[in-house]
């Protein structure tokens, strides 16, 4: 190996991010950037890291997929009994990060978390392929299992159980919405002097924008 990890670096030169050019509303600004990520045909532009923690501050993070967003917040779906589901039930605060390397951009979001409505969870669940719906029954997410064969056996059992009938949504599976209090837009710049614009929600539900030092 000719290069060490310390040698790995890239100079960011594609774009700039100006207070004059961004939307005053962070959701509209996110929509603008997300549409540009789609237009650039990035692989899974809706992939995001979500960080949660226990009440005593033990953190954990993983990748999930954004499935909806509007001015109410950012929605993903999961097993409520999973580690993240349990942590969010006990400590309903989370942080999200989108990283769009090809555009030299990231978006950081933090805020409180709440479950979406039953109808929203149903709507998305029934839009999924049948095997994905079965997977919500098969996997006791985050629990230790003896082998891969355990999952495959359970899949066969549920395929037989729901053969030729509608697969219902498990009560332990559904959507969660991150309701942001802060959203930061980061644009890579040359010499590591990146552009960082932070939107913070005020008491009157308006947003103020500040530039952060990189």
UniProtKB/Swiss-Prot annotation:
Binds 1 FMN per subunit. It comes from the Bacteria. FMN binds at residues 62-67, 77-78, 83-84, 106, 141-142, 186, 196. It holds the Pfam family PNP_phzG_C. Substrate binds at residues 9-12, 67, 124, 128, 132, 192-194. It catalyses: pyridoxamine 5'-phosphate + O2 + H2O = pyridoxal 5'-phosphate + H2O2 + NH4(+); pyridoxine 5'-phosphate + O2 = pyridoxal 5'-phosphate + H2O2. InterPro entries: Pyridox_Oxase, Pyridox_Oxase_CS, Pyridox_Oxase_N, Pyridoxamine_oxidase_dimer_C, Split_barrel_FMN-bd. Its EC number is 1.4.3.5. One of its GO terms (biological process) is pyridoxine biosynthetic process. HAMAP family: PdxH. PANTHER family: PYRIDOXINE-5'-PHOSPHATE OXIDASE (PTHR10851:SF0), PYRIDOXINE-5-PHOSPHATE OXIDASE (PTHR10851). This is Pyridoxine/pyridoxamine 5'-phosphate oxidase. It comes from Trichormus variabilis (strain ATCC 29413 / PCC 7937) (Anabaena variabilis).
């Amino acid at each position: 190996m000719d290069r060490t990890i310390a040698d790995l670096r890239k100079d960011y030169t594609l774009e700039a991010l100006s207070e004059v050019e961004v939307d005053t509303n962070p959701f509209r600004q996110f929509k603008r950037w997300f549409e540009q990520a789609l237009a650039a045909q990035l692989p899974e532009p809706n992939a995001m890291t979500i960080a949660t923690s226990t009440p005593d501050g033990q953190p954990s993070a993983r990748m999930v997929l954004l499935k909806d967003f509007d001015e109410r917040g950012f929605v993903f779906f999961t097993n409520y009994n999973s580690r993240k589901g349990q942590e969010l039930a006990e400590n309903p605060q989370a942080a999200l990060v989108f990283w769009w390397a090809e555009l030299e951009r990231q978006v950081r979001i933090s805020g409180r978390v709440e479950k979406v409505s039953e109808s929203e969870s149903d709507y998305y669940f029934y839009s999924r392929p049948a095997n994905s719906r079965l997977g919500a029954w098969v996997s006791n997410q985050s629990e230790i299992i003896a082998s891969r064969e355990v999952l495959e056996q359970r899949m066969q059992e549920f395929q037989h159980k729901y053969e030729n009938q509608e697969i219902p949504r498990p009560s332990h599976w559904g959507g969660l919405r991150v309701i942001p209090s802060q959203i930061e837009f980061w644009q890579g710049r040359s010499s590591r002097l990146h552009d960082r614009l932070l939107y913070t929600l005020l008491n009157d539900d308006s947003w103020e924008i500040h530039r952060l030092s990189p």
